[in-house]
From Swiss-Prot:
InterPro entries: FAD-bd (IPR002938), FAD/NAD-bd_sf (IPR036188), FAD_monoxygenase (IPR051104). The keyword Glycoprotein applies. Changing residue 235 to A: Converts 10% of substrate to dearomatized product. Belongs to the paxM FAD-dependent monooxygenase family. It comes from Talaromyces stipitatus (strain ATCC 10500 / CBS 375.48 / QM 6759 / NRRL 1006) (Penicillium stipitatum). The keyword Membrane applies. One of its GO terms (molecular function) is FAD binding. This is FAD-dependent monooxygenase tropB. Glycans are attached at residues 153, 243. The active site is at residues 206, 239. The chain crosses the membrane at residues 12-32. It comes from the Eukaryota.
Length: 447
């Protein structure tokens, strides 16, 4: 009977987000702004992010604005700065610059115009601290380590079971729980290779140095702008953060061995060890490494390249960000792809919320599955391309030919390819993505 689809006592649409990292909180902010009932379940005691830097493209910032303008406020109030402004700060355009890190000249090899505020960089911990203030009190629950997900049938709520013995009942679940996602393990099985990230055979020495020290090592122009130092089997990137008081450093090296500890992606290292990998590189770059603390960390680069997820959603469960498509950081835009995910999922769930208002739980549950199916259809190909491309550009940065004067011309031919790949990330048409997602959702619902 048609009347059986109407339920005036229907509860608000409830979404459980597993993971309180940057993508999870941004997604929650977008949903809250659209009147959707949201809970974020974070396994840690509080919000914790490493102090390393991260950057967002102008496109990603525009996606943030569509989700909730308060997210952009949080970004800029946390000390975000353009990463690589024009020479002597005379212009507001951002540039990505590649320089010769191996030879003494430190010659600029290529420059790519990212536009006005093309990239904005911040410290992860400071951004997350500001982001959390965007959410109303009570949205986030900490110390909630996901144990199991119970899916009874299509008409009932999804139940989240936590390690502390508590439960949560929600209409749908979004896994934003990062590279070691428990939600992903639920979808594919704990023993499946699709459920776990795999070593890319690269690791990084990461840290922050003061702007004063960076200037003494590199000169003011390089210290205050983003530069990628390329060379054989390694590369180093740096850019300013924290209102230009600090410089974020990431030195990536190739590793033919397997990562020794699959339970931890971070291991101890020393400054001297890092400098050993760059022993034959130019003095300025080695001076940068010399300003790192004596005891530093070695970060393994794991991703989903070897076993990409066959799907990002099933029924009323969906994956976003690193939980769906963890990538190595060589494009510097992994979080940007996650923000695209958050915008797409938010707009689709808002459509579910509006189009099923007053209708039965059967209709709503079917609509959620249709929305997540649409998300999978429009997001998976681009996200998996990004995972592949992140590996590819690292190979270009670390070509052995950089060290061979007779083969350098071959290495330098890589920049047109890098430009094309970068533009595919920077100039993504998110409005067309949203239009396609809504059209697919409505088609799936027969409307």
């Amino acid at each position: 009977m048609p009347g059986s689809l109407i339920d005036t006592r229907q509860q608000p649409l409830s979404v459980g987000i597993v993971g309180g990292g940057i993508i999870g909180v941004i997604l929650a902010a977008g949903l809250v702004r659209r009147g959707i009932d949201v809970k974020v379940f974070e396994q840690a005691r509080g919000f914790r992010e490493i102090g390393a830097g991260m950057a967002f493209t102008a496109n990603a910032v525009r996606c943030m604005e569509m989700l909730d303008p308060a997210i952009v406020w949080a970004l800029r109030s946390s000390g975000a700065v353009p990463i690589s402004i024009g020479d002597h700060q005379a212009e507001a355009r951002d540039y990505l610059r590649w320089v010769d890190g191996y030879h003494e000249s430190s010659k600029r090899l290529y420059q790519l115009d990212a536009g006005i505020r093309g990239f904005e960089a911040c410290r992860r911990d400071q951004f997350l601290e500001a982001l959390v203030k965007v959410l109303p009190e009570g949205i986030v629950e900490c110390q909630k380590r996901l144990q199991k997900i119970h899916e009874k049938n299509e008409t009932e709520k999804v139940t989240l079971e936590f390690a502390d013995g508590t439960f949560a009942h929600v209409d749908c679940v979004i896994g934003a729980d990062g590279i070691r996602s428990r939600v992903r393990q639920h979808l594919f099985g704990e023993d499946s290779p699709y459920s776990h990230p795999h070593y890319s055979h690269k690791f990084a020495f990461r840290g922050l140095i003061t702007m004063e020290n960076a200037i003494s090592a590199l000169g003011e122009d390089k210290a205050r702008t983003l530069n990628m130092h390329v060379g054989p089997n390694a590369h180093l990137i740096h850019y300013p953060v924290a209102n230009e008081t600090m410089v974020n450093i990431a030195a990536f090296v190739s590793d033919p061995e397997e990562w020794p500890d699959k339970l931890s992606l971070v291991g101890p290292a020393t400054r001297e060890e890092a400098m050993g990998y760059f022993a034959n590189w130019n003095p300025g770059l080695r001076a940068v490494l010399g300003f790192m603390p004596e005891n530093i960390d070695r970060w393994a680069m794991f991703d989903t390249y070897d076993y990409p997820a066959p799907f990002f959603s099933r029924g009323k469960i969906c994956l976003v960000g690193d939980a769906a498509h963890a990538a190595v950081p060589h494009h510097g835009a992994g979080a940007c792809i996650g923000i695209e995910d958050a915008l797409c999922a938010t707009v689709l769930l808002a459509e579910v919320f509006v189009s099923t208002r007053g209708k039965s739980s059967i209709v709503r549950n079917r609509a959620i599955a249709a929305a997540f199916g649409s998300f999978n259809a429009v997001r998976r190909v681009r996200a998996q391309w990004f995972v592949d491309s992140s590996r590819r550009v690292c190979d270009l940065y670390q070509q052995p030919e950089w060290a061979d004067p007779q083969k350098r011309i071959k290495a330098e031919n890589c920049f047109e390819e890098i430009k094309d790949r970068s533009h595919k990330i920077w100039h993504f048409d998110y409005n067309s993505m949203l239009q396609e997602a809504i059209e697919k959702y409505r088609h799936n619902m027969g409307s």
